[in-house]
Amino acid sequence: MNTFLGILIPFAGTTLGAACVFFLKNEIKPLVQKMLLGFASGVMIAASVWSLLIPSMDMSEHMGKLAFIPAAVGFGLGILFLLLMDRLIPHLHLGCSEPEGKKCSLKKNTMLVLAVTLHNIPEGMAVGVVFAGMLAKNSDISMMGAFALSIGIAIQNFPEGDIISLPLKSEGNSRLRAFGMGTLSGIVEPIGALVTILLASYITPVLPYLLSFAAGAMVYVVVEELIPEASEGDHSNIATIGFAVGFVIMKIGRASCRERV
């Protein structure tokens, strides 16, 4: 039951963010949007380090001086995976007029949802891998640590759902349709997490690689998309403050979890 709840928490964050379309008349002000993007970046970087990379290295201590290999290899593969997906899957980022990936005839709204869905893949994997490690009774992953990651990603997902649904409404879509598309962008997370957990018995031997793989993919999203979007135009300093706040909150949450374990 705890595991099921844990993998649904990030999706709940996306759903709540998308639900803002029922309460807000206009798009989020640029200043607030920059703050949210910076905050999301800080949360994801902190989660990548403390919930994924460090446990990956701790699990590889038996390799002695080569303990860094699983973390390094997995991290690199995670970045390459998202880079490949970015090139192959047609998608459109907010504020951009030209779609990325392979050329296709998909509607603009569909490609907007695909862009966020693409970035939610590693987050779902990250949650699934961590809970799989917890179920496998790995001493380097606690239930509190797994929930800290899940809650952190949910916090990051809230502005994502919001940033998708409000622009869709502004472009003429109904509130319900905008909410549905914003919510749909996050459905890949619980699905990916559940599949990962179901394969737990098979992935345990390569868990360090999978943890760092998820970290690499999440860092790619931050560096490739979130930070550039947060830095463009005015209010870039607000994004930096948001990054610091998100990073510190995740650090405090992680420290609290370690004290309770």
Language model features with spans:
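Intrinsically disordered, metal-sensing/regulatory segments
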Residues: M1-R258
